[in-house]
């Protein structure tokens, strides 16, 4: 009887031009991830060269029939969330990388693309919630084992370089559609402008059934929406957050 191969799980940070990611997967799947990101980025860059408006618009973009898959996914997700297509770029690239690793045989694969996480996990994993200078710290979501990809995406007006029209310390959205989780997190963050807005910021998600849960944090206040994984205590190490150096 042949003994199954045993691989060492590897955590590594990579930068591919503007894409800065952390990858957690068995070591043989890391090249699969990187090859996919190079390919997908190339397709996206070629499309942007053809129509620079795609990169700059903050409104949903009408997708041409001949657009590559990465562009089609971004357009579909952001049309539902009411934001520009680049609001879904990180989640879409991360998802396509995890899809490729899973297709190659990975049972556990996670890509954190600047706070937008795509994962498939054959064991429980805790995803930390980082809300910058907010006093709400040390919390995470315990994701149970699953054999399909999940998106856990976070937008913030106070952490990182992403555009936000709100003031949230964290706007987190969960969906099986990672592109949609990314787009909806941006849209949620835009709506969290003050503590009072937490009461209504989630209302638009009622029209997006693919979103299963969300968290909004501003200052010392937190609100939740939908069905969330178990919220647990977690040590959120700032140095492990995917970001530029």
Curated annotation (Swiss-Prot):
Transmembrane segments: none annotated. InterPro entries: ApbE-like_sf, MA1715-like, UPF0280. Gene3D superfamilies: ApbE-like domains. SUPFAM superfamilies: ApbE-like. Belongs to the UPF0280 family. This is UPF0280 protein UNCMA_16740. It comes from Methanocella arvoryzae (strain DSM 22066 / NBRC 105507 / MRE50). The lineage of its organism: Archaea, Methanobacteriati, Methanobacteriota, Stenosarchaea group, Methanomicrobia.
């Amino acid at each position: 009887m042949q003994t199954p191969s045993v691989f060492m799980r590897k955590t590594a940070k990579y930068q591919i031009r503007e894409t800065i990611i952390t990858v957690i997967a068995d070591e043989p799947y890391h090249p699969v991830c990187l090859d996919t990101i190079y390919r997908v980025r190339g397709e996206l860059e070629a499309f942007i060269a053809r129509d620079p408006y795609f990169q700059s618009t903050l409104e949903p973009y009408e997708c041409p029939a001949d657009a590559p898959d990465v562009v089609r996914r971004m357009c579909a997700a952001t049309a539902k969330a009411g934001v520009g297509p680049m609001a879904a770029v990180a989640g879409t690239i991360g998802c396509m990388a995890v899809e490729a690793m899973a297709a190659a045989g990975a049972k556990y694969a996670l890509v954190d693309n600047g706070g937008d996480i795509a994962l498939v996990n054959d064991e429980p994993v805790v995803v930390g919630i980082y809300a910058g200078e907010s006093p709400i710290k040390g919390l995470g979501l315990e994701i149970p084992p699953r054999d399909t990809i999940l998106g856990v995406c976070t937008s913030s007006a106070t952490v990182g370089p992403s555009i936000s029209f709100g003031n949230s310390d964290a706007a987190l959205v969960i969906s099986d559609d990672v592109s949609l989780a990314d787009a909806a997190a941006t849209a949620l963050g835009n709506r969290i402008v003050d503590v009072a807005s937490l009461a209504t910021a989630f209302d638009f998600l009622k029209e997006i059934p693919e979103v299963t849960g969300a968290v909004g944090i501003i200052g010392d206040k937190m609100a939740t929406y939908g069905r969330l994984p178990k919220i647990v205590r977690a040590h959120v190490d700032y140095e492990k957050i995917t970001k530029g150096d």
